[in-house]
Amino acid sequence: MSTIKIEKKSQLVKEVFDSVASRYDTMNDIMSLGMHRLWKDRMVNSVHFTKNSKVLDVAGGTGDIAIRIVRKEPSAKVTVCDINQNMLSRGRDKAINSNQINFDWVCANAESLPFEDSEFDYCTIAFGIRNVSDRKKALNEAHRVLKPHGKFICLEFAPMHYQNEIFTKLYDLYSFKVIPKIGSIVAKDKSSYEYLVKSIREFPTQADFKMEIEEVGFKNVEFHNMSYGIVALHIGTK
């Protein structure tokens, strides 16, 4: 299996999400059997958002996390940031349909955020960190824009490592054969979903990603597995 070259990743990611934006939520439901909704609920419910807090949701184009945050804490001021304008447009439409009209929507790269130092109380990112070209830059930027004692909350798929050979083969079959086939049928785009599966396989283990978060300066970093380690929630404090 070939790896994704860093120098080509930004353009590839843009093309992938340009292609799947209109059917992104539908595909998430189909591929995860609806579980992505529960994972996102747990992510938001794991954090106590203080009143009038400023939250930056990175790679948050679909608005899923932002909408959940303001439902939990209506006074929160949420900025949704995504590198892909098509995803932001879809998220803005979804937010309006959910009667959430007070978000700020910013098209920007997670590796070069257009915000001041120490501007936000919380920085969230769900299923986005594996798509950045340079994780260290993105993590450094998250650390920079957070206030002292601010929280970094990251939800991401994890590479699966099972001792059970049969389960491993079934998981690989579903990931590399079934998911791209579903993408071909539902989203008319097989190659984009081949990329998404490959990006999960190339992501570091939960323990290794924890170390990456710590290396940029976050303290008290911990992670919690969900659904037997299919996804993991990492939380750190500036």
Curated annotation (Swiss-Prot):
InterPro entries: SAM-dependent_MTases_sf, UbiE/COQ5_MeTrFase, UbiE/COQ5_MeTrFase_CS. The keyword Transferase applies. S-adenosyl-L-methionine binds at residues 62, 82, 109-110. Pfam families: Ubie_methyltran (PF01209). It catalyses: a 2-demethylmenaquinol + S-adenosyl-L-methionine = a menaquinol + S-adenosyl-L-homocysteine + H(+); a 2-methoxy-6-(all-trans-polyprenyl)benzene-1,4-diol + S-adenosyl-L-methionine = a 5-methoxy-2-methyl-3-(all-trans-polyprenyl)benzene-1,4-diol + S-adenosyl-L-homocysteine + H(+). One of its GO terms (molecular function) is demethylmenaquinone methyltransferase activity. Methyltransferase required for the conversion of demethylmenaquinol (DMKH2) to menaquinol (MKH2) and the conversion of 2-polyprenyl-6-methoxy-1,4-benzoquinol (DDMQH2) to 2-polyprenyl-3-methyl-6-methoxy-1,4-benzoquinol (DMQH2). PANTHER family: 2-METHOXY-6-POLYPRENYL-1,4-BENZOQUINOL METHYLASE, MITOCHONDRIAL, METHYLTRANSFERASE. This is Ubiquinone/menaquinone biosynthesis C-methyltransferase UbiE.
